[in-house]
UniProtKB/Swiss-Prot annotation:
It comes from Oncorhynchus mykiss (Rainbow trout). Its main location: secreted. The modification Pyrrolidone carboxylic acid is found at Q25. It is found in: Secreted. Keywords: Amidation, Cleavage on pair of basic residues, Hormone, Pyrrolidone carboxylic acid, Secreted, Signal. This is Progonadoliberin-2. Belongs to the GnRH family. PROSITE patterns: GNRH (PS00473).
Length: 86
């Protein structure tokens, strides 16, 4: 029982100190609890030029690239295996 009390005594201040030092979200600056943001606060100036350009033409960076990465990893592994066999 003494070790449990000692553990609580040590973890309590450590938890309080960790909460103070962490970079948690502050609810001022237009944010509400739960990560919600006021929708009316967005202005047209917050839309980046890259997104405006992508509306006119297709943007490849908006498409998921996971398939290409996986394909490249598999091809590299096969190429290494082929080089080992030579």
């Amino acid at each position: 029982m003494v070790s449990v009390a000692r553990l609580v005594f040590m973890l309590g201040p450590l938890l309080c100190l960790g909460a103070q030092l962490s970079s948690s979200q502050h609810w001022s600056h237009g944010w509400y609890p739960g990560g919600k943001r006021e929708l009316d606060s967005f202005t047209t100036s917050e839309i980046s030029e890259g997104i405006k350009l992508c509306e006119a033409e297709g943007c490849s960076y908006l498409r998921p690239q996971r398939r290409n990465i996986l394909k490249n990893v598999i091809l590299d592994a096969l190429a290494r295996e082929f080089q080992k066999r030579k």
